[in-house]
């Protein structure tokens, strides 16, 4: 067995971020293939296909062919042990995605090289900026007609404010895509189409001036490549590890995930350069991965991962020390010690009990309603990890039951889904309405679908006159009580019983903020 320090050194924990349809799920498949976690990559096919992608395991995801929940997968690659967190890339991803990014040490940004920087990528990059997360970039779909690679890199630099350092460079594109030149290894790796479902035997030509290169790709294309590379090397940044680790520079790889080409080059870079498990801040001190006592935080809760078991699993990022099966942990918020002997490890839907886990690893704890997002577990020290946020929703609906007798099941379902971070639920102080808030429209559909399939509750939405929500705080109890009394028509409790101001319009919110200067109206709430 390796010692704790060595176990930490070999771990890399990262998430994949992208715009919908940039090829994130396909890349996840291919990454797992290289890690030998799955033998035949289950490419994301049309809905009729039996071969569903391994990381899209929830029923709704299988139906739609999109990733709705965050899957967690661990696999070995060369001398490292990689923890990959797959995030929803679809239009309406939820806070789940934001919070997943608090549990990783680096990110892989997947860009469709035909389209360049897209809206969702911008939003996700903003989140990675909050913690200066190191970013590796994969320009995907080079086997299709793509934009000029230099132009796409310029767009990344200008729009995402991060310097680009090309590590590989594409040779041709679309039907004439011949492979990539690796700037650091001074070699050309040739592409063979039609082998996307398996590990390829690759042909490599050493050196840019090698006559073999002219034979392999044709002298015209070889000459064009040499000229292009002169320009590229002159006009782009060189890779600098320090700038990468600060989140200021991204190494760029080109390839095709569907054709299973270039993914291994990116994985080589990730395992070589991405940081090992990093320290995390608590309210009192920084905890490093080399601290000997165990600690970890909950960043996600997933209900009904296994319909046979009707269970809920809390996902924990291990920050320090070592988890051992049967160990006693202190659940800080609750103030109780718990013995954990059945923590889980995952490859998307396939679960097995974990014997031990180290910093950087993600483990699943069975949750019977006692664990919340943001909870800290230690070996006794009263710590609370910070930086795991709730965001004020941007869309609201009133939810109604088709069968009024199922109010109890509806409430239970909504509270559990809210604990997961899929949506937020608000209960107004002055009436019995239930208001659901979400970051995007898809979340509403997801909730109604899951209420029906997992809780046997049929519900419908109605429009409601709510523009935004803010969590309210006031140090002066008397002033808070007066505020509650006078504004009760606009106040509600969220799933965690936190007082929330539900504003019908922005004008109304601004007026209330002026009227009650001692009350803080917050857009985000620390868990």
From Swiss-Prot:
Q: Which residues form the tr-type G domain?
A: 9-278
Q: Where are the transmembrane segments?
A: none
Cellular component annotations (GO), alphabetically ordered: cytosol
UniProt keyword annotations, A-Z: Cytoplasm, GTP-binding, Nucleotide-binding, Protein biosynthesis
Q: Which Pfam families match?
A: EF-G_D2, GTP_EFTU, RF3_C
Principal place where this protein is found? cytoplasm
Subcellular compartments: Cytoplasm
Query: Quick one: a GO biological-process term for this protein?
Result: regulation of translational termination
Chain positions recorded as GTP binding sites: 18-25, 86-90, 140-143
Q: Name one GO molecular function term.
A: translation release factor activity, codon nonspecific
Identify its protein family: Belongs to the TRAFAC class translation factor GTPase superfamily. Classic translation factor GTPase family. PrfC subfamily.
Task: Outline what the protein does.
Answer: Increases the formation of ribosomal termination complexes and stimulates activities of RF-1 and RF-2. It binds guanine nucleotides and has strong preference for UGA stop codons. It may interact directly with the ribosome. The stimulation of RF-1 and RF-2 is significantly reduced by GTP and GDP, but not by GMP.
Tell me the protein's name.
Peptide chain release factor 3
Name of the coding gene: prfC
